[in-house]
């Protein structure tokens, strides 16, 4: 049983259970607090930003990304690099790549433009999926990268609900 099969099994058996949680203490909580949760005597500290997805949603997002890759000719033997911050979207993208049979090339978010270019060249990556925070670094070497590698900005994946 592969790791992809484990995701499929969990999505089938526990579709509504929480699979992934993202907590960012630097972002304010957007959830409304009800009167019963509100502390009348003493104010509590702000809750950190929290986002979660269920096993069913996790599987759905991975499938959508896998389908997008497959429709664009990415499959077995191809290499897809991921340049994202540590976020809840990272794993569905990772599993989506694995579902196509392609290889995942995770890149460290601390890499400079030249290091990104070097790693993509060394890995012979066919696609680079990157977050908005990396636009500047990717643009700095886009001329060299785009000759061999298709660039895919994460914000473009919003239409796929990924």
Residues of each region from the PLM?
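A short N-terminal helical cap/helix-turn-helix that marks the beginning
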Residues: 1-21, 41
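Residue-level recognition of oxygen-bearing side chains
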Residues: 2, 64, 89, 124, ...
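Aromatic/hydrophobic pocket-lining residues that form π-stacking "cages" and hydrophobic walls in ligand
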Residues: 7, 93, 138
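Solvent-exposed, charged/polar functional surfaces in cytosolic regulatory/catalytic domains
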Residues: 9, 13, 64-68, 144
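Residue-level preference for short coil/turn positions at secondary-structure junctions
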Residues: 14-16, 76, 121-124
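Conserved AMP-binding/adenylate-forming core of the ANL superfamily
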Residues: 20-87, 91-94, 112-117
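Structural core segment of the AMP-binding/adenylate-forming
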Residues: 71-72, 99-162
């Amino acid at each position: 049983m592969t790791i992809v099969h484990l995701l499929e099994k969990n999505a089938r058996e526990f579709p509504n259970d929480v699979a992934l949680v993202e907590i960012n203490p630097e972002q304010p909580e957007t959830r409304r607090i009800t009167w019963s949760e509100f502390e009348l005597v003493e104010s509590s500290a702000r809750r950190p930003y929290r986002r979660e997805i269920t096993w069913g949603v996790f599987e759905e997002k991975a499938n959508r990304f896998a389908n997008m890759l497959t429709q664009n000719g990415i499959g077995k033997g191809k290499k897809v690099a991921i340049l994202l911050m540590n976020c809840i979207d990272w794993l569905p993208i990772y599993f989506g790549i694995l579902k196509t049979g392609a290889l995942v090339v995770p890149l460290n978010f601390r890499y400079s433009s030249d290091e990104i270019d070097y790693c993509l060249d060394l890995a012979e990556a066919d696609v680079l999926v990157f977050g908005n925070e990396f636009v500047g670094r990717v643009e700095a070497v886009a001329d060299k990268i785009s000759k061999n590698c298709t660039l895919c900005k994460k914000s473009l994946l919003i239409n796929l609900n990924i």
